Amino acid sequence: MPIQKRKPTSAGRRFVVSVVNPDLHKGAPYAPLLEKKSKSGGRNNNGRITTRHIGGGHKQHYRKIDFKRNKDGIPAKVERLEYDPNRTAHIALVCYADGERRYIIAPKGLKAGDFIESGDASAIKVGNTLPLRNVPVGSVIHCIELKPGKGAQLARSAGASVQLVAREGQYATLRLRSGEMRKVEVECRATLGEVSNSEHSLRSLGKAGAKRWRGVRPTVRGVAMNPVDHPHGGGEGRTSGGRHPVSPWGTPTKGYKTRSNKRTDKMIVRRRNKK
């Protein structure tokens, strides 16, 4: 996909770098697969902020994505590729032979007119979904289930992919982009190929307002606050915070381990690489 740098006709355009995909559908999305998406502004049912830096942004509809890919043995034709404001990857509208339409995460290289299918007997082809026990070792995959039938949870964002490196007994071993090696049941499903829109990481929004259009509010540094608001706040003049970095609630940050799901530790063969 071509990457466009804008002519600096204004300060807000000077640093804009956008990724343009001419193959994306330019009309409205498929209405029966849309859902209302209301904004919370980061507040809970008491009106209190539970997630900071959320608010405003353009109105959006949620696109119902088929993460389970459980319509087995029925081929589907890709009608078009679409932009989805709810995720970094592009999505594809597919029409099954029985007339049903669904949205799926579009893999890299998929285009309008292609055919895909799901199930044990599916061909080894980009866009097809099948259990890990039927995927050749060494294959690049995405949209992987962690529990059979639950729906895809791993490798769903733009450019994401995982490599199947081994299969032994009832478990398959996956190598994630982070360097982590993880075991997953062989009955879990995965889609062949990598996720589309891999150039997403090259874009630059160019100005603060573009972030506000996406519903992201400013992040204020702790050292710029008062002591009542943050452990790094206060002091005469500019300070460095005076202690190791912590969150507003005093939890160490910048590298502090917070993973507490011991139940699934046994599935991790090797921890991810340190950055």
Swiss-Prot record:
Keywords: Ribonucleoprotein, Ribosomal protein, RNA-binding, rRNA-binding. One of its GO terms (biological process) is cytoplasmic translation. InterPro entries: NA-bd_OB-fold (IPR012340), Rib_uL2_dom2 (IPR014722), Ribosomal_uL2 (IPR002171), Ribosomal_uL2_bac/org-type (IPR005880), Ribosomal_uL2_C (IPR022669), Ribosomal_uL2_CS (IPR022671), Ribosomal_uL2_dom3 (IPR014726), Ribosomal_uL2_RNA-bd_dom (IPR022666). Residues 34-59, 223-275 are annotated as: Disordered. SMART domains: Ribosomal_L2, Ribosomal_L2_C. GO terms for molecular function: rRNA binding; structural constituent of ribosome; transferase activity. One of its GO terms (cellular component) is large ribosomal subunit. The keyword 4Fe-4S does not apply. The keyword Cell membrane does not apply. Gene3D superfamilies: 2.30.30.30, Nucleic acid-binding proteins (2.40.50.140), Ribosomal protein L2, domain 3 (4.10.950.10). Belongs to the universal ribosomal protein uL2 family. Part of the 50S ribosomal subunit. Forms a bridge to the 30S subunit in the 70S ribosome. One of the primary rRNA binding proteins. Required for association of the 30S and 50S subunits to form the 70S ribosome, for tRNA binding and peptide bond formation. It has been suggested to have peptidyltransferase activity; this is somewhat controversial. Makes several contacts with the 16S rRNA in the 70S ribosome. This is Large ribosomal subunit protein uL2. It comes from Teredinibacter turnerae (strain ATCC 39867 / T7901).
